Amino acid sequence: MTNLEVRTAAQCVENPYLPMRMVIQRITDEVDDRTIKSFDLAFMDEEDARRFRYMPGQFCELSVFGQGEAPFGIASSPTEQGFVRFTVKKAGVVTSKLHSLKPGDIIGMRGPLGNYFPLDLMRGKDVVVIGGGFAFTTLRSLIVYLLEGGERDQYGKIIVIYGARTPGLLMYKEDLAAWEKRDDIQVVQTIDVAVPGWTKKVGFVPNVTEETAPKADNAIAVICGPPIMIRFTLPVMTKLGFQKEQIYTSLENRMKCGIGKCGRCNVGPKYVCLDGPVFSMAELAELPPEY
């Protein structure tokens, strides 16, 4: 590792291909079957730490040396100091290797990359956050930022609807429990099928959304989840009065290089990694139907 070329934040524009070295500070199992883990990373270069700035919705490329790299949405909030968190589902070569690492191991990170959630548009409005399963990662970043960014009074109601197949597949359990105790956010957790001991909602996310979401008169919605969940939730949002310009989502599949060079995430005139990953449904309606 000692001969690895180190990228500092000052070199970002000159050479976006070089990763910054990050040390794994903490690893947390997020679900009962241990297939999803959160990695809290700390900067090894103080200048990198000083200059690194990101917003909810952005992503980074994480690299395991000798194995490859892959894009991951940032799960921490800019308001959380001392670490950058990524939640990783074990699926392929890079993610499997990440899951085998331990605190103290070193990996690479490029970023932050892409755009972010429309925080300016959310000011003065109710914010509805709808998530399903593993796709709750960048939504956690958004929620923590709205609550802890020092401007909670700039937003209206914050309503979070989060669903998974079983209780054991709901991530960020400590966060969810803490949010439920607050009076400035409404958290609705739901699972697909009732199980013994579960006292919260039972039902699919689209149905729970119809029961819970506010009127669309002064609201912005952010939806992230499996494609089938989004597909059945969108008609519900339309029924509630939400226009396409009021609904945002994040596209992360197909991205590879993160900087618009490989062309893998190209859709019509857009590159998901450059023009996104956050898009309004109005923007997506103008694109070819690849997504």
Regions found by a protein language model. Give the residues of each.
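Local cysteine-cluster metal-coordination motifs and their immediate loop/turn environment
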Residues: 228, 252-277
